[in-house]
Amino acid sequence: FQDKIDLVANDLEEYFWHEKSKVIVNSFGAYLFLHAQLQLKPYPGHVLILPPIIGVSNHNETMMRFYPPHADTLLQAATDGVFLCPINAQVHVGSKDWQSGSDGVVSFGAITGMPVSVVDRQGHMLSVDHVGRLLDEHLTR
């Protein structure tokens, strides 16, 4: 897992470390990006974070559970005040997203200062219309 984080951190620094950079991360890719951010200064570019995985999630109705590697690291870093969030980030998560856990993502955003938009009645796969609008906005900034 650490080798993937290191690869993301290296690629960000090597190829995308400027204010005009635009990065889009989704789900587990967001998880890797956020872990890479722990090793870096605040990312200077624009980041669109679509339903991020930030740690453990449970779905009580189906008894499903998702437990990624280093599941407590991001929340602990945020709580300890050592997570340096990207300078220009926006996070979007569906209100019915059990994989990301919208309540946890909102809490993480509040602790770190990253703005989080909860998309009503959507799950982990945000609608094409919603994501399309976000991409248009993100890529034309």
Map each language-model feature to its residues.
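Gly/Ala-rich beta-loop-alpha elbow adjacent to hydrolase catalytic centers
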Residues: I24-L34
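Active-site nucleophile elbow and catalytic-triad environment of alpha/beta-hydrolase enzymes
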Residues: T62-V82
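Acidic beta-to-alpha connecting loop that harbors the catalytic carboxylate
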Residues: S95-D97, D120-G123
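Active-site catalytic motif of lipid deacylating hydrolases and related acyltransferases
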Residues: F1-E19, G123-H124
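Short beta-strand/loop motif that positions the catalytic acidic residue
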Residues: C85-P86, V91-V93
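Conserved alpha/beta-hydrolase "acid-adjacent" motif
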Residues: W98-G104, S127
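Catalytic histidine-centered segment of alpha/beta-hydrolase-like enzymes
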Residues: Q122-R133
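Active-site nucleophile loop of the alpha/beta-hydrolase fold
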Residues: L48-S57
